[in-house]
Amino acid sequence: MAAPVRRTLLGVAGGWRRFERLWAGSLSSRSLALAAAPSSNGSPWRLLGALCLQRPPVVSKPLTPLQEEMASLLQQIEIERSLYSDHELRALDENQRLAKKKADLHDEEDEQDILLAQDLEDMWEQKFLQFKLGARITEADEKNDRTSLNRKLDRNLVLLVREKFGDQDVWILPQAEWQPGETLRGTAERTLATLSENNMEAKFLGNAPCGHYTFKFPQAMRTESNLGAKVFFFKALLLTGDFSQAGNKGHHVWVTKDELGDYLKPKYLAQVRRFVSDL
């Protein structure tokens, strides 16, 4: 029994030594590969963080005929299956006391509040008649003022800004160049901070970019060490504030997904449309 056990132990020891040699060789080759990899600082591509700032709808969209029919059906079912509210029970009780009054079976103390529920209903009716719904079509819609945030209230709006690239004015999403030591989301947050004198507050949707776009600089600006830029987009929902008009009139617009094509270049538009939602 001792001989087979000894042979087994020797075989295991030999296999372990071979594994150690292979693993050491693998580690050395990996270290060489990492050492040979070029540094990202020498890349001819500049990194940019862009902000896809969206204003969500502030009113619901008009119902379609099918939705109206379904809503009416659900409301009718709710009425038929619901229980009486406290006010309805009170009104029923007062109706019974009114019937007793007609039959001279009431107490004089009940006369003071016998019509209280009806008085409340009359008051609520007057308030309802005085209430007026806000207009869905705003003044900005009538003037087609796309610099105003008070337009297309039932649609999702996206902020675009006009920047100068070489001798061309180009519409893009707000962006800034990445700086060492910050994350790409941090770059997008810095972009938001520089807009409208820091008076806009937004909620970023995650730490990962929702899209990217690569472009080359114009020939006049392009060099071997500066070929172009890679843009990474980050979504954010506008909470408060607006883009300041001071000194920037005509340099920004709030547009729907359908209106993006009026401003963006075709290739840039194709990338942006992938992640812009139209709620």
Curated annotation (Swiss-Prot):
A biological process (GO) annotation for this entry?
Answer: mitochondrial translation
Question: Taxonomically, which superkingdom?
Answer: Eukaryota
Which residues are modified to N6-acetyllysine? 230
Give the Gene Ontology MF terms in alphabetical order: structural constituent of ribosome
Question: A single Pfam family, by name?
Answer: MRP-L46
What Gene3D superfamilies does this protein's entry cite?
Nucleoside Triphosphate Pyrophosphohydrolase
Q: What are the record keywords, sorted?
A: Acetylation, Mitochondrion, Ribonucleoprotein, Ribosomal protein, Transit peptide
**One CC-aspect GO term:** mitochondrion
User: SUPFAM superfamilies attached here?
Assistant: Nudix (SSF55811)
**Cellular compartment(s):** Mitochondrion
Q: How does it assemble?
A: Component of the mitochondrial large ribosomal subunit (mt-LSU). Mature mammalian 55S mitochondrial ribosomes consist of a small (28S) and a large (39S) subunit. The 28S small subunit contains a 12S ribosomal RNA (12S mt-rRNA) and 30 different proteins. The 39S large subunit contains a 16S rRNA (16S mt-rRNA), a copy of mitochondrial valine transfer RNA (mt-tRNA(Val)), which plays an integral structural role, and 52 different proteins. mL46 is located at the central protuberance.
Q: Which family does the record claim for this protein? A: Belongs to the mitochondrion-specific ribosomal protein mL46 family.
How is this protein named in the record? Large ribosomal subunit protein mL46
